[in-house]
């Protein structure tokens, strides 16, 4: 909704309900550390006030409330048909200030333009946890555990024209956060920010590309076959500043106790080759992904 003010200003309200299910298919998981089944249900509302920033950017002040529900198994050794899930849920409030400049030509698989994005957030809320009754764990439910943290995320994504046939894209992304770990390893990974630079990475779950603090970068050589068709090779590297790791107690192997690893101690990368047909109303792609962890 655009407001009748001297400076162009708009008010944007969003209400979203999301229900995600990650099945037992191993195509979605790359190590047995992550449970074979995860369900995430999210209900959140956002209110944003936007206005121009400098000449070609916009700024937004936002407030949000969300109820996040995670249902998961902490081990794959439990017979799945008889299993019930651990349940973590969160009531979170946040305030944010963001600045964005975006001239990318498309939302998916862009080949020209530039995006610069910076957001600062303050988040506060509570965590509650109920263990699965079939997990044989000695864990007790936890009451309201308060979490508060500051988070800063920056992203630079730009595509340059090298010739009539070739473009080159590059990406840099960084997240800095004071966020604490959750009750257990799986809950901590589920609630950590994820690096999802491709459409495919947005619909699968991979713990190797989740961390509360990380740096990531990428290169995208692009061959333009026609005005609507192009071939691209997207290559990305991901380095958690402090990787989320887990310790398994001997007296209760079901539970993973989370802790932070050493500074910049791990590095993962992913690659995707894709042929993309970009229509005015639809994007069609045929791709092959490679992930190394």
Label each residue range with its predicted role.
Residues 1-104, 108, 190-199, 204-215, ...:
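Gram-negative/organellar outer-membrane beta-barrel architecture
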Residues 40-49, 93, 121-130, 149-159, ...:
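A short, hydrophobic secondary-structure junction motif
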Residues 85, 94-226, 230-243, 248-250, ...:
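C-terminal outer-membrane beta-barrel translocator/porin domains of Gram-negative envelope proteins
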Residues 248-290:
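C-terminal beta-signal and terminal closure region of outer-membrane beta-barrel proteins
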């Amino acid at each position: 909704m655009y407001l009748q003010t001297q400076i162009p200003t708009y008010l944007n309200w969003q209400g979203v309900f999301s229900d995600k299910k990650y099945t037992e298919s191993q195509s979605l998981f790359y190590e047995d550390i992550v449970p074979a089944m995860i369900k995430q249900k999210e209900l959140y509302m956002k209110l944003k006030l936007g206005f121009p920033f400098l000449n070609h950017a916009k700024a937004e002040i936002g407030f949000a409330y969300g109820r996040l529900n995670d249902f998961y198994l902490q081990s794959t050794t439990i017979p799945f048909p008889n299993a019930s899930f651990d349940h973590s849920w969160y009531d979170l409030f946040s305030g944010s200030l963001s600045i964005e400049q975006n001239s990318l030509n498309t939302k998916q698989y862009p080949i020209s333009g530039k995006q610069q994005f910076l957001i600062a957030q303050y988040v506060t809320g509570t965590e509650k946890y109920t263990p699965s009754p079939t997990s044989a764990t000695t864990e007790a439910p936890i009451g309201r555990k308060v979490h508060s943290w500051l988070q800063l995320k920056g992203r630079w994504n730009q595509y340059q024209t090298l010739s009539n046939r070739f473009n080159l894209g590059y990406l840099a992304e960084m997240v800095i956060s004071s966020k604490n770990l959750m009750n257990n390893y799986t809950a901590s990974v589920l609630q950590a920010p994820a690096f999802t630079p491709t459409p495919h990475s947005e619909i699968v779950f991979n713990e190797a590309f989740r961390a509360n603090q990380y740096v990531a970068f990428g290169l995208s050589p692009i061959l333009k076959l026609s005005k609507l068709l192009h071939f691209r090779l997207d290559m990305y590297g991901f380095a958690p500043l402090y990787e989320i790791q887990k310790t398994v107690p001997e007296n209760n192997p079901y539970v993973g106790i989370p802790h932070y690893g050493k500074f910049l101690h791990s590095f993962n990368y992913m690659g995707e080759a894709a042929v993309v047909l970009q229509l005015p109303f639809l994007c069609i792609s045929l791709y092959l992904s490679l992930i190394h962890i």
